[in-house]
């Protein structure tokens, strides 16, 4: 059973039966653990030993953060502290041996066992990912059929934070030597500055991202709510994990979900 076949089988079980029967599946123990406990693994998963010649490890060469190390036996190790979730290694891999973490199974489990309301925080990118037939209303209805209480569009908080950054820019920039690195929306941008150009961090506004702001707002209105972020960006998972590890008290575990 390939990894994709395993993933689809487990997803079907979770939807139809309400749980995954892992003991009935003949698959790699490593693959099973990644799908059942993605939070315990890096954002990028090597599925098998790398088939490329050692001097042509394209994924490692594409990583700006030196997060990928190739062992002598050909297996790859991804450093979760260095990986920012940019996805460059996945695009560079010519054998299709790398995949982004899949978090749908834990998301469905969180919806099923939630003791309070469950809200989907939807990234603005959904407007360009589906056909024009998929309206916000239809998407909200689909989430409700899956067990969600409702849907919140994160675009609203992006607008609010853009205004906040504009006000900060107006307050902080007075001379030709003053500058501010904007865009709190992008965790990849912030991660790059923090890890490669850390001396510039004082020039980054202190605003949280729209995803975090949306989660905080929902938790303010419904303290017992579960919030699940839905979007196409792998780096949002790194951001969510950072907030969780920092004991983020403004909201529940916010995970990025990819179809």
Residue ranges and their predicted role:
Residues 52, 82, 203-207:
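Alpha-helix N-cap/helix-initiation motif
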Residues 42-46, 76-83, 221-230:
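Immediate flanking context of iron-sulfur cluster ligation sites
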Residues 21, 79, 255-259:
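A diffuse structural propensity rather than consistent per-protein peaks
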Residues 54-84, 88-104:
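Iron-sulfur cluster-binding cysteine motifs and their immediate structural context
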Residues 36-37, 66, 80-84, 115-120, ...:
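Short amphipathic alpha-helical segments, especially helix-boundary/capping motifs
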Residues 21, 32, 37, 41, ...:
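Residue-level detector of short coil/turn "hinge" positions at structural boundaries
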Residues 1-62, 66:
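Ferredoxin-type iron-sulfur electron-transfer modules and their immediate structural context
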Residues 2-14, 28, 101-259:
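Iron-sulfur-associated redox domains of electron-transfer enzymes in respiratory
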């Amino acid at each position: 059973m390939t990894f994709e076949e395993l993933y689809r089988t487990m997803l079907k079980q979770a939807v139809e039966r309400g749980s995954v029967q892992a003991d009935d599946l003949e698959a790699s123990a490593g693959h099973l653990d990644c799908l059942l406990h993605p939070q315990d693994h890096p954002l990028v998963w090597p599925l098998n030993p790398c088939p490329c010649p050692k001097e042509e490890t394209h994924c490692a060469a594409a990583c700006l953060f030196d997060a990928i190390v190739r062992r002598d036996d050909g297996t790859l190790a991804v450093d979760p502290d260095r990986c920012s979730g940019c996805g460059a290694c996945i695009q560079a891999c010519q054998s299709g041996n790398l995949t982004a973490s899949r978090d749908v199974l834990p998301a469905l489990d969180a919806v099923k066992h939630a003791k309070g309301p469950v809200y989907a925080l939807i990234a603005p990118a959904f407007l360009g990912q589906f056909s024009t037939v998929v309206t916000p209303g239809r998407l909200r209805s689909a989430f409700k059929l899956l067990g969600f209480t409702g849907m919140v569009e994160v675009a609203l908080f992006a607008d609010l934070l853009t205004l906040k950054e504009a006000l900060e820019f107006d307050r902080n920039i007075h001379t030709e030597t003053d500058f501010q690195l904007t865009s709190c929306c992008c965790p990849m941008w912030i991660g790059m500055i923090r890890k490669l150009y850390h001396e510039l961090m004082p020039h980054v506004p202190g605003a949280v991202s729209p995803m975090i702001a949306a989660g905080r707002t929902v938790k303010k209105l419904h303290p017992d709510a579960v919030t699940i972020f839905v979007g196409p960006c792998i780096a949002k998972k790194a951001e969510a994990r950072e907030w969780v590890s920092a004991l983020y008290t403004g909201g529940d575990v916010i995970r990025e979900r990819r179809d």
